[in-house]
A protein has these predicted regions:
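Phosphopantetheinylated carrier protein domains
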Residues: 39-63
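Short alpha-helical elements of helix-turn-helix
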Residues: 4, 37-40
């Protein structure tokens, strides 16, 4: 899963205090400023970009806590499609 593409979407839609350069694959996005409201915007942008739909079971904080966790979730959804 392209972490750089996910990073770009997170930076555009997450309204984080951290810059894109500061985000590693395992950086805590909530500690970087991601809120519940911006998580919804981020989720919708990710669904559009990757042509997936996050099921209810993936709508928790754990799915969106890092670039890596987002990539793993998208990879799982793509594999199941």
């Amino acid at each position: 899963m392209p972490i750089d593409q996910i990073r770009d979407i997170v930076v555009r839609h997450g309204r984080l205090a951290a810059s894109a350069a500061d985000l590693t694959p395992t950086s805590d996005l909530y500690a970087a400023g991601l809120s519940s409201l911006t998580t919804v915007h981020l989720m919708l942008a990710l669904e559009d970009a990757f042509d997936v739909e996050f099921p209810d079971r993936m709508l928790g904080r754990k799915t969106f806590e890092s670039l890596q966790s987002i990539a793993e979730a998208i990879q799982e959804l793509k594999a199941a499609a």
